[in-house]
Design a protein with these regions (language model features):
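C-terminal catalytic subdomain
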Residues: 48-74, 78-135
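Short, catalytically relevant binding-site loops at active-site mouths
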Residues: 3-4, 22-23, 79
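ATP/adenylate-binding site constellation spanning eukaryotic-like Ser/Thr protein kinases
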Residues: 1, 10, 19, 75, ...
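General structural signal for secondary-structure boundaries
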Residues: 7, 33-34, 83-84
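Short acidic-glycine loop/turn motifs at beta-strand connectors
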Residues: 1, 7-12, 131-135
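PP2C/PPM family metal-dependent serine/threonine protein phosphatase catalytic domain
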Residues: 10-60, 104-116
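Short hydrophobic-aromatic micro-motifs
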Residues: 5, 14-16, 71-74
Length: 135
């Protein structure tokens, strides 16, 4: 599964997609919290896979980006290793090259050496950061 997240410079979460999975739907509906979702034994079960016959493509809300918004697109390894509020805090400010290096470092560290009280799941790690150029 993947993460799409949009945050403003001040840290306001403007958009987050719902994971196409039973755990993602349970999280979205409030049946479980983020902590329970990250550690759920079925967190890797997905209900929508690219290239399958039953694949569906959902178009989310149309949103206008502000000059200092940051868009994050990532594989599931980012939300499997950082809480959403941590991701927002890391990406909301700073040069994207530094933000990317910082994200990579903390995710790789948590994959190698999971710490109590923090998520940590070894997996492939892919992400894209985008921020509109100031007008």
């Amino acid at each position: 599964d993947s993460l799409i997240l949009l945050t403003g410079q001040r840290g306001r979460l403007k958009f987050q997609n719902t994971s196409h999975s039973p755990v993602g739907y349970a999280l979205e509906s409030g049946f479980i919290n983020e902590e329970e979702a990250i550690h759920h034994e079925e967190r890797n079960l997905v209900s929508n896979v690219i290239g399958t016959v039953g694949m569906s493509i959902e178009i989310g809300p149309e949103m206008e980006l502000s000059p200092r918004d940051t868009l994050v697109l990532s594989s599931d390894s980012l939300p499997d290793n950082l809480y959403v509020d941590e991701i927002v805090e890391y990406v909301r400010t700073g040069r994207l090259e530094r933000v990317a290096a910082r994200l990579t470092g903390i995710v790789e560290q948590r994959m190698r050496n999971p710490e109590p009280g923090h998520p940590g799941h070894s997996d492939d790690f892919t992400f894209i950061l985008y921020r509109p150029a100031p007008g």
